[in-house]
């Protein structure tokens, strides 16, 4: 029996990827037998007979926003999604994401580049002082301490990176083609990572004043660089003015008195010592999911304060810990102060069908987020580069092409390293994995490992920069900064001895990305995915750009039917031969 369907081709599904609600989408199936299409919503399904046409059967749908799954029945056989998204006899269904009519994402970030900065470790300008219980480090570039001498993890040492330091390096950041700087938390806090917010309406004094921050955002805007604020709204610090466990603030906190105006924000089982905290960390008391006063404070005060200070986006930390209603309120508040303000969520899985705490999240079916951190793609790129097999990479790309709305796909935050992951050069270069954090401080790549890591990093960044979405470079990756898990992935930027060759590689791929409009929203097609050889295109016609990579162990010969122009490669001869870890970026010859 003949049966053919592929939702990633407009021949079979008139709109690829997510579909706008109430817009018509046509499904077409090649079949020599009558076909019934079954469409599942969250709690029901409908069967509809497809209409016969030349060569097969079709059916038009107009759906309200929501998450749907579908399959076909023909000739007594159930057809579902195969590994390549084509129809095969299986129980696995295709996903259909239907998003709201009024959903859109900011254009300014598409085709752009994000640069992530851990503020304490990027650049220091001038001296600084620290408060009670904090440790001042005078040795810029020294190894961060994991455990204090008493064995406790305090995260209380500061190297002094600050707003003025970042501002002094904006020209360098611009040379990397950067459009947006994502700053890890900058609010007043006890720790150097600042995920334990002390005061949402005050920058940390080590970083500088609010005037210093406004100067930074103003200088950034003059260079078309905009700043993304890290919104930590699931928990506060135990020492915050709102909880005030250590009596550091004059204000009465929830820990101090049940009559505190902040008492409603927190969950106490037995006041004051027994309370809900994030993953059991007593230094991070969690906010009640339904605290209306906290949500109003964030939307009316916090968002306004930082937008007025110059931010153009917010990244929501552990967004799956927040309710969809709260995320909607944050989005509404942020967009009310600028329709093109950018909202990113920290989601580690496919955000279009994410389930957390038993609830299906509606990040895209309700149009809540513009973007998420694309950890699934990170995993797939690393898997490809390390194993020399593109199977997972291909599957991940097909899945995201099918599941995400196009405007979301073009806005995904594509990461390789972050403050929560091992540095990419360390991950790709090392022979062995160290699991004991106390030993990671002594983990450095030897000469051979560094060379391998660097070569692989270049290969990985070609994918990161030229697939759909927006590449996000973690400060220091472009200069070969090493480091395993936290805190070793948060070392100081080396302004004296960085790897200039690697930095030049980043500048080259950034220039290609910024100089070709296809990387903003151009269609992506996989041309060849076989073993270690992966070839894809962006755009169509004369503007089309082809990217070829070889993560395998053997040299691959490439042939082109038309004259081409090489934009960048690491080829070692005039022939189009991709050696292991080779890459080639070409366009049609003018």
Where are these predicted regions, by residue range?
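Carbohydrate-binding surface patches
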Residues: 14-19, 23-26, 32-33, 526-561
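Conserved, mostly hydrophobic/aromatic
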Residues: 117, 173, 183, 200, ...
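Active-site-proximal helices and loops of the catalytic beta/alpha 8
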Residues: 217-226, 235, 240-251, 302-304, ...
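Aromatic/acidic polysaccharide-binding cleft in carbohydrate-active enzymes
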Residues: 120, 358, 414-445, 461-499
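Beta-strand-rich binding/interaction modules
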Residues: 34-44, 68-70, 554-571
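The feature marks proteins involved in alpha-glucan
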Residues: 1-28, 43-116, 122-146
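Substrate-binding/active-site clefts of carbohydrate-active enzymes
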Residues: 118-179, 186-309, 330-337, 353
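C-terminal beta-strand-rich structural cap/linker in extracellular carbohydrate-active enzymes
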Residues: 574-590
């Amino acid at each position: 029996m003949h049966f053919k369907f592929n939702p990633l081709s407009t021949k079979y599904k008139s709109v690829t990827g997510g579909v706008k609600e109430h817009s018509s989408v046509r499904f077409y199936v090649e079949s020599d037998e009558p076909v019934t299409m079954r469409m599942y919503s969250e709690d029901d399904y409908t069967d509809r007979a497809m209409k016969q046409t030349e060569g097969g059967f079709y059916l038009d749908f107009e759906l309200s926003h929501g998450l749907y799954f579908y399959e076909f029945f023909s000739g007594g056989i159930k057809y579902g999604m195969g590994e390549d998204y084509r129809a095969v006899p299986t129980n696995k269904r295709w996903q259909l994401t239907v998003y709201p009519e009024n959903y859109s994402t900011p254009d300014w970030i598409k085709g752009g580049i994000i640069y992530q900065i851990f503020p304490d470790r990027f650049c220091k300008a001038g001296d600084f002082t620290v408060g009670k219980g904090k440790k001042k480090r005078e040795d810029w570039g020294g190894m961060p301490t994991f455990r204090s001498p008493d064995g406790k993890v305090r995260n209380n040492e500061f190297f002094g990176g600050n707003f003025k330091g970042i501002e002094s390096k904006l020209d360098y950041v611009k040379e990397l083609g950067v459009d947006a700087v994502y700053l890890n938390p900058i609010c007043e806090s006890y720790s150097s990572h600042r995920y334990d917010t002390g005061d949402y309406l005050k920058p940390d004094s080590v970083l500088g004043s609010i005037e210093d921050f406004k100067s930074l955002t103003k200088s950034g805007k003059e260079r078309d660089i905009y700043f993304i604020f890290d919104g930590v709204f699931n928990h506060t610090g135990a020492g915050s003015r709102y909880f005030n466990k250590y009596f550091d603030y004059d204000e009465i906190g929830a820990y101090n008195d049940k009559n505190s105006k902040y008492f409603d924000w927190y969950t106490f089982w037995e006041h004051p010592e027994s309370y809900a905290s994030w993953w059991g960390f007593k230094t991070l008391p969690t906010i009640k999911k339904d605290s209306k006063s906290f949500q109003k404070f964030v939307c009316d005060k916090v968002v306004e304060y930082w937008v007025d200070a110059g931010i153009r986006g917010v990244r929501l930390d552990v967004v799956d810990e927040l309710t969809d209603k709260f995320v909607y309120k944050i989005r509404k508040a942020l967009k009310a102060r600028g329709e093109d303000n950018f909202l990113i969520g920290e989601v580690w899985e496919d955000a279009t069908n994410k389930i957390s705490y038993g609830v299906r999240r509606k990040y895209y079916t309700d149009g809540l987020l513009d973007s998420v951190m694309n950890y699934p793609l990170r995993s797939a790129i690393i898997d490809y580069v390390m194993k020399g097999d593109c199977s997972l990479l291909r599957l991940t790309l097909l899945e995201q092409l099918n599941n995400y709305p196009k405007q979301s796909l073009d806005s995904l935050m594509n990461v390789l390293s972050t403050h929560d992951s091992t540095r990419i050069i360390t991950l790709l270069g090392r022979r062995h994995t160290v699991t004991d954090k106390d030993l990671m401080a002594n983990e450095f790549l030897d000469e051979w490992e560094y060379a391998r890591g660097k070569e692989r990093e270049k290969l990985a960044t070609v994918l990161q920069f030229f697939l759909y979405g927006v590449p996000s470079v973690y400060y220091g990756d472009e200069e070969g900064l090493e480091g395993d898990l936290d805190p070793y992935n948060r070392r100081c930027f080396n302004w004296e001895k960085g790897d200039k060759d690697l930095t030049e590689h980043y500048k080259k791929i950034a220039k290609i990305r910024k100089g070709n409009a296809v990387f903003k929203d151009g269609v992506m097609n996989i041309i060849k995915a076989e073993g270690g050889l992966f070839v894809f295109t962006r755009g169509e016609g004369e503007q089309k750009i082809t990217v070829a990579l070889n993560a395998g162990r053997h040299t691959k010969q490439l042939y082109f039917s038309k004259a081409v122009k090489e934009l960048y490669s690491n080829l070692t001869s005039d022939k189009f031969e991709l050696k292991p870890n080779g890459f080639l970026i070409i366009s049609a010859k003018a």
